[in-house]
């Protein structure tokens, strides 16, 4: 018993000595025990969607992490990223938008609530330039959200300077892999959110399984703590006029909470994510709002016939909308088992592997 105790003391002394040497070499905080001041709760920035914040498990995108948003064209990827910027700015955050596609619509960003006067915007010429700008911004320690739109537009310098028909196999994937190795640690230390918007491509010759893949190789899939698959489900019409899209978002990877949760919300043209639409959908699921046929009502108050009429009512009756929203948030906060989204187990081995890594 005495020999075992002495051995444990010697092992602990050797470990303390090793930790002391590491701290001398790399500075205090380079290594520590979890009980010595590690952050237990991960800070987050809201996505602008109550349902998506809930599905992500921590109230939004995790700070100090890399996030990937991917999906087909016109599915709402940039809209979601701009909502994150708007939410960060509301709390005094500094945000940057790396517009590699050279397609940022400033007027649309303003309609989503982005303070474009304080937004840092860059339109880089090459992928290397874009990633260097990201590195400088992150290293400043003064940035809260950086959006790169998009990975597919991060064209390597060699490809731009070469001829149109030249073959450049794997250049972009190598560029991104090298950059992410550097960015991961500094993003964590700066406690900012780095969002990459990505496009979808089709793999040739796939007979079984999902033929879709994202651009830029596999590095981003591994380094991302959260990956969101965003899709347009159907058009929202006012008579014959299309006024928005019903959108589905699936959390295909989540390192900070359980993955594979799925939410639906409306993205309205010139408005973005419809807050009142979410209030109605979640209110119905939580039995806060009553739905009888096409009629919606709350506490005996008739909100309207049809969802669009109910949305119009809540837009003009702020007190009622705020009251319902507060009840939804209180119910979600008090009961972690409340489900306002679908949880789908994945039969796709590709998706399961991404969730693990």
Curated annotation (Swiss-Prot):
Keywords (A to Z) from UniProt: ATP-binding, Cytoplasm, DNA damage, DNA recombination, DNA repair, DNA-binding, Nucleotide-binding, SOS response
Residues binding ATP: 71-78
One Pfam match: RecA_C
UniProt cross-references to SMART domains, sorted A to Z: AAA
Magnesium found in the keyword field: no
Compartments reported by the entry: Cytoplasm
Family from the record: Belongs to the RecA family.
PANTHER family: MITOCHONDRIAL DNA REPAIR PROTEIN RECA HOMOLOG-RELATED, RECA
Name this polypeptide is given: Protein RecA
The species this protein was found in: Ehrlichia canis (strain Jake)
UniProt gene name: recA
